[in-house]
Amino acid sequence: MLVNAWQKTFFFNFSQERVNITGAGRTDSGVHALAQVAHFDLKKKIETTKFLRGINQLIGNKPVTVLKINKTNKKFHARFDAKKRTYQYTIVNRQSPLALQKNKAWHIRKKLNTKLMEKGAKLLLGTHDFSTYRSASCGAKSPIKTIKKVSVKKNGEKIIVKFTSKSFLQQQVRSMVGCIKYLGDGTWNFDDFKKSFKAKNRLKCAPPAPSCGLYLRKIIY
């Protein structure tokens, strides 16, 4: 939807040019983005303030907004120039149903052991073959990725899981969280979790966490 609005803005209001938009990352349906970056090439000069106002008017009341527009060099690529991406997964661990956080977090009623979840998450640090957490439809050439940072933090009834890497496989974060959840709720012990990871086999993965709790949190260039 955002790409379509951008193209309409350019084509009808600004440049009469067809513009291709490239985002920094692709997300599954239902996943949120707190920080998304995109680039486009344009021959005609535009007034950025006017453009920003125009694109947000076209977006209307949809839950999307463009916060800033910057001019950059011709070689910049929103996807390939990114050095780090941080994804955040939000779990609400309580008995009562969600209200304001509905469709924005994973509601889990069974009490979770966050210390054990953190132990499992830290096992994923470093460079590994993440085939267990790779979607069957993933188009990446290699399952090898490097997790640079992980954290599992509990704040009241909220549990926030974060992963930082240069890039991720399709459904990797949701799959890792699904396995960490199995560890936290007692479905698996730590040895089960480790065997699943080391198996490098998608069939050994727990069900992926639902998309509603996942957020693209930060992109660093």
Predicted segments — roles?
Residues 1-221:
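Structured-RNA-binding interfaces characteristic of tRNA pseudouridine synthases
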